[in-house]
Regions:
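Hydrophobic alpha-helical transmembrane segments
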Residues: 78-101
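Alpha-helical transmembrane spans of integral membrane proteins, capturing the lipid-embedded, hydrophobic core
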Residues: 29-33, 109, 113-117, 208, ...
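Small-polar-interrupted transmembrane alpha-helices in polytopic inner-membrane proteins
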Residues: 110-129, 178-192
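Interfacial segments of alpha-helical transmembrane regions
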Residues: 24-26, 95-118
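Hydrophobic, membrane-inserted alpha-helices
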Residues: 69-72, 88-94, 160, 186-190
Length: 235
């Protein structure tokens, strides 16, 4: 009986990795552990009410910034963290990976984004924190709960993995620029949520932590899947 053919490993230039997803098993464990530990600390602060001390001070300072150019920049930034933008970026990347016969990469993008959306929904339901309604400005207040920030969580879990797959075969300088841009986008998305007053700063920090935690878990599973493929082909 013939054994089914395994999906061939990607041929060509050896990939030179810069950051996430190529961090290996130990790196994935460390990233996930640190991020999830920080999320727990942040969640405890929110539940105990201790986060209010810095939430109010930061929001007061941020809300002093109020001008048309800044508003336009923040509006663009906050759109990058929406479900539509995140889903589109992940979907197009997955399709591109499939067309290149990079099934593991495509699956990783889908799982990372879909899992992040599910985690966001679950966490909001668990904590049920009310949004800072009296501080919202120039934007429609979402009906969902406040903690954690979904825009921040989805951005942290999706953009690094999307950028990684798009530039992983490029030179190290190109990868460095791409991941730096991803980092700036993630930070801008989080800041925009505080700027518009639809989230407390602690919501954004919690979203970042949960997102990076899930990113670490995704990176770990991706590395394990590729290692299994290599072992099967070596038999």
């Amino acid at each position: 009986v013939k054994k089914p053919k395994k999906e061939p490993l990607r041929q060509g230039k050896r990939r030179q990795h810069f950051l996430p997803l190529a961090i290996g098993r130990s790196g994935g464990v460390v990233l996930a552990a640190l991020a999830l530990w920080f999320f727990k600390q942040q969640a405890d602060e929110v539940v105990d009410g201790h986060a209010d001390r810095y939430d109010e001070a930061i929001m007061e300072a941020v809300h002093r910034i109020d001008n048309a150019p800044m508003h336009n920049v923040m509006h663009a930034a906050t759109q990058l963290g929406s479900h539509v933008a995140i889903g589109t970026a992940a979907g197009l990347t997955a399709i591109m990976m499939l067309r290149q016969n990079r099934k593991h990469d495509a699956w990783t993008v889908v799982v990372s984004t879909g899992g992040a959306m599910a985690i966001n929904t679950i966490l909001k339901h668990v904590f049920q924190r009310q949004r800072p309604k009296e501080l919202a400005r120039r934007i429609k207040l979402p009906k969902s709960h406040s903690f954690p920030s979904g825009h921040s969580l989805l951005s942290a879990a999706t953009y690094p993995i999307v950028l990684h797959h798009l530039v992983e075969r490029r030179s190290m300088p190109v990868q460095a620029v791409a991941h730096t841009m991803a980092g700036l986008v993630i930070l801008s998305v989080g800041f925009s949520r505080v700027y518009f007053g639809v989230h407390f700063p602690s919501d954004v920090l919690g979203g970042f932590a949960a997102g990076f935690g899930w990113l670490g878990i995704t990176a770990l599973s991706h590395t394990a899947a590729e290692a299994t493929d290599r072992a099967d082909l070596a038999e």
